[in-house]
Swiss-Prot record:
Principal subcellular localization: cytoplasm
Name of this protein: 3-isopropylmalate dehydrogenase
Binding site for Mg(2+): 223, 248, 252
Naturally occurring in which organism (per UniProt): Diutina rugosa
Swiss-Prot/TrEMBL cofactor(s): Mg(2+); Mn(2+)
Residues given in the record as NAD(+) binding sites: 77-88, 287-298
Keyword Membrane: no
GO terms assigned for molecular function: 3-isopropylmalate dehydrogenase activity; magnesium ion binding; NAD binding
Entry function: Catalyzes the oxidation of 3-carboxy-2-hydroxy-4-methylpentanoate (3-isopropylmalate) to 3-carboxy-4-methyl-2-oxopentanoate. The product decarboxylates to 4-methyl-2 oxopentanoate.
GO biological process, one term: L-leucine biosynthetic process
Length: 359
């Protein structure tokens, strides 16, 4: 049975990287008996504003809701400024409408050849391998806020409920259980100061102890974790569990470790991938890079996002493994875009991965 994938290329380099990911998915289709994908392309972001006046047309949203998974490129750019209608609103809306409560961002090296590209020393970062699991729909970003009304005071409220923390904790624990032995879950909070963090810590402890007794877990204060991330990131290997704002910050800090945003995939999930068919939206961590000339963007983050999609939403872990192996082979062969020290174009990197899959 064919798996339906909605493509949302978005703006600028988003269109290029999604095209390369589709090229790779079609190679998987050709080389894997019984595997079939149906693609449907829709507008989001600035491209949608230009064509329809809104950053997420109803047609795109309805198509996404009816699909098995969504692959997104990137949205935004200076052309659309910071007015009332902005490209980023399309991304926020689709996350909310699709119920995407968990954001997963791996931090590892696609090839050992890339370790020396890290801004940190090889002996510090070698072996780094964790995934940040960020709660995506609660916390301070969605809390009550009060703008300065002339009084010189403004406020934002951090609120978490037990069910919200339970849900994201189960996601982290489930991902830890996919390894043998189970990986450690590192829960980050600020329980020495914040009431919301004390609820977070208490709830994480109960869920892990009662529901996942075989999964080791540790609590870590967010400021301490931020230091560990630059001192010895391998100490956090496993699954890093965080609230919305802390996850936003720590995942961006982690993203510089592998040396290029062009390498980093992400997933946003609406349910546990316990049957490998969780609905999700997949996208590279990099932005739309409006200043980058055509053919220069690194497509690997989007291609690796497609691999995550195969593993978590489309029940095809074997194909995901093949893509990740092909990416490793291509990097090791020296075919790479400029951000990785190479001279290959976007399309040449995609073609090389297709060739590796078809050999």
């Amino acid at each position: 049975m064919s798996k339906s994938i909605v493509l949302l290329p978005g703006d600028h380099v988003g269109t290029e990287v999604v095209a390369e990911a589709v090229k790779v998915l079609k190679a998987i289709e050709r080389t894997t008996p019984g595997t079939s994908f149906s693609f449907s392309t829709h507008l989001i972001g600035g491209a949608a504003i230009d064509a329809t006046g809104v950053p997420l047309p109803d047609e795109a949203l309805e198509a996404a809701k009816a699909s098995d998974a969504v692959l997104l490129g990137a949205v935004g750019g200076p052309k659309w400024g910071t007015g009332d209608v902005r490209p980023e609103q399309g991304l926020l809306k689709i996350r909310k409408e699709l119920g995407l409560y968990a954001n997963l961002r791996p931090c590892s090296f696609a090839s050992s050849k890339l370790v020396d590209l890290s801004p940190l020393k090889r002996e510090i970062v070698e072996g780094t391998d964790f995934v940040v699991v960020r709660e995506l729909v609660g916390g301070i970003y969605f809390g009550e806020r009060k703008e300065d009304d002339g009084s010189g005071v403004a406020s934002d409220t951090e609120t978490y409920s037990v069910p919200e923390v339970e849900r994201i904790t189960r996601m982290a624990a489930f991902l830890a259980l996919q390894h043998n032995p189970p990986q450690t879950v590192w829960s980050l909070d600020k329980a020495n100061v914040l009431a919301s963090s004390r609820l977070w810590r208490k709830t994480v402890t109960r869920v892990m102890t009662e529901e996942f007794p075989t999964v080791p877990f540790q609590h870590q204060l967010i400021d301490s974790a931020a230091m560990i991330l630059v001192q010895k990131p391998t100490k956090l290997n496993g699954v890093v569990l965080t609230s919305n704002m802390f996850g936003d910050i720590i995942s961006d800090e982690a993203s510089v470790i592998p040396g290029s945003l062009g390498l980093l995939p992400s997933a946003s999930l609406a349910s546990l991938p316990d049957t490998n068919t969780a609905f999700g939206l997949y996208e590279p961590c990099h932005g739309s890079a409006p200043d980058l000339p055509a053919g220069k963007v690194n497509p690997l983050a989007c291609i690796l996002s497609a691999a995550m999609m195969l593993r978590l939403s489309l029940d095809n872990a074997a194909a995901a493994d093949r893509i990740e192996q092909a990416v490793r082979e291509v990097i090791d062969s020296g075919v790479a875009t400029a951000d990785l020290g190479g001279s290959s174009s976007t399309g040449e990197v995609g073609d090389a991965i297709v060739k590796a899959l078809e050999k």
